[in-house]
Amino acid sequence: MMSTKIDGKQIAAEIKTNLAERVNKLKAQGIQPGLGTLLVGEDPGSMKYVAGKHADCQEVGITSVKKELPADASFDDIAAAVRELNEDPACTGFIVQLPLPKGINENAIIDMIDPAKDADGMHPYNLGELVLHVRGDISTPLPCTPRGVLELLDAYDIDLNGKEVCVLGRGITIGRTIGLMLTRNAVNATVTLCHTGTRDVADHMRRADVIVAAMGSAGFVTPDKIKDGAVLVDVGVSRVYDEEAGRYRIKGDVDKACYDKASAYTPNPGGVGPMTRAMLLANVVEMAERHA
């Protein structure tokens, strides 16, 4: 079977080109979009991720608004930084980089974000809007990774109407939220959400036209668990030690041996990741356009 590699890097680049044009139009109206980030501590992964977001901003003409706090910052320190970003007119939307240091109530911090400035689309108000709006357009920010997955499939003309979609993992960042987006009238998929309590996960996977793997279990999706012609979307991230190279590598949930059996697949890395970052920028630009 001829399998299609779904190139997230290429589609994300096309989206960023479009966003840059829209940013220029906003600037012509005297509006300068700005993305804020709040980073607490010096976790290497978080620092790299935040730096990548600001590099993306520079590409499309979005201003960067950076706030950094030490690892021993108190809850009150972090809450004060969130309030400052809420009130900063240069910041159209912002994210609080997770995870926060141990002992900090992350949900309480996220609750403090102004929903209209929630660039990640993960504030309870915005998630509630997603639950309520089964029909019609949604004018609130959408979660970046699920939105990126749907944009990617749409770019490759993969129609999900009536399709069986098996989602592996029930995390709020992707598993639970993508189920809400997939079952909206505009998409119209039938979703099975599998998790650690699901019996016979492989049986659900073999029935699926599309599998969205977001477990963080390296190589969990193997050829014997999928049907011929399935579409595979790999969102999982695991650090696996490579004995030959003598270092850790990032591996996805989908075993590469599945690619030949699939009709289409997202590589990992290079599939969903670039789209998540592009959707963060899209949320910020759309926030600015709503106020134009």
Swiss-Prot record:
Which Gene3D superfamilies does the entry link to?
A: Leucine Dehydrogenase, chain A, domain 1, NAD(P)-binding Rossmann-like Domain
Q: Name one Pfam family in it.
A: THF_DHG_CYH_C
Q: Where is NADP(+) bound in this sequence?
A: G169, R170, G171, T196, V237
Reading the lineage from the top rank, the first entry is Bacteria
The metabolic or biological pathway listed in the UniProt record of this protein is:
One-carbon metabolism; tetrahydrofolate interconversion
Concerning its family, UniProt says:
Belongs to the tetrahydrofolate dehydrogenase/cyclohydrolase family.
Protein name as catalogued: Bifunctional protein FolD
Which organism is this protein's natural source? Bifidobacterium longum (strain NCC 2705)
Source gene? folD
